[in-house]
């Protein structure tokens, strides 16, 4: 009887932990969807923050300023900085991004942060 209670407790624990792991993975996946990585390029030039993918939704109200990526990047990009300091890459040719640019001020570069 004691072994069956232990086994049931173990299976309940595994089920709870498994569901938590799935939830965490789903949250991280959702975060990557809205905040694609910004990768710092170069060894000598420390001012080149580049975008390799773009966020699909740009909520302008969340951002306080922006700056363009450097000319040494493969893809052009606009990096928006949120109130929390999060960096979000956006496509500069997107109409929604252009609207955001008209309402926000251009700010300083990111300070050489590496976001992966």
UniProtKB/Swiss-Prot annotation:
Organism from which the protein derives: Mus musculus
Pfam families: IL8 (PF00048)
Chief location category: secreted
Domain of life where this protein originates: Eukaryota
Physiological role: Chemotactic factor that attracts mostly macrophage, but it can also attract B cells, CD4(+) lymphocytes and eosinophils.
Protein name: C-C motif chemokine 6
Segment forming the signal sequence: 1-21
Tissue expression per record: Expressed in myelopoietic bone marrow cultures stimulated by GM-CSF.
UniProt PTM comment: The N-terminal is proteolytically cleaved by proteases associated with inflammatory responses. The processed forms CL6(22-95) and CCL6(23-95) show increase in CCR1-mediated signaling and chemotaxis assays in vitro.
Location of the protein in the cell: Secreted
Alphabetical GO biological process terms: immune response
Hydrolase recorded as keyword: no
Disulfide bonds: 50-73, 51-89, 60-100
One Gene Ontology term, aspect cellular component: extracellular space
Protein family according to the UniProt entry: Belongs to the intercrine beta (chemokine CC) family.
Signals that turn on the gene: Associated with stimuli that promote myeloid differentiation.
InterPro entries: Chemokine_b/g/d (IPR039809), Chemokine_CC_CS (IPR000827), Chemokine_IL8-like_dom (IPR001811), Interleukin_8-like_sf (IPR036048)
Keywords: Chemotaxis, Cytokine, Disulfide bond, Secreted, Signal
Gene3D superfamilies named in the record: 2.40.50.40
SMART domains membership: SCY (SM00199)
UniProt-recorded Gene Ontology molecular function terms: chemokine activity
């Amino acid at each position: 009887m004691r072994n069956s209670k232990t086994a049931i407790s173990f299976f309940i624990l595994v089920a709870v932990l498994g569901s938590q792991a799935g939830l965490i993975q789903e949250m991280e996946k959702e975060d990557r969807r809205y905040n694609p990585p910004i990768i710092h390029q170069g060894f000598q030039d420390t001012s080149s923050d580049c975008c390799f993918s773009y966020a699909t939704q740009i909520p302008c109200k969340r951002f306080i300023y922006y700056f363009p990526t450097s000319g040494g990047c493969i893809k052009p990009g606009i990096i928006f900085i949120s109130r929390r300091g999060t960096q979000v890459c956006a496509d500069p040719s997107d109409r929604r991004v252009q609207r955001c640019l008209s309402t926000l001020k251009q700010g300083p570069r990111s300070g050489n942060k590496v976001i992966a």
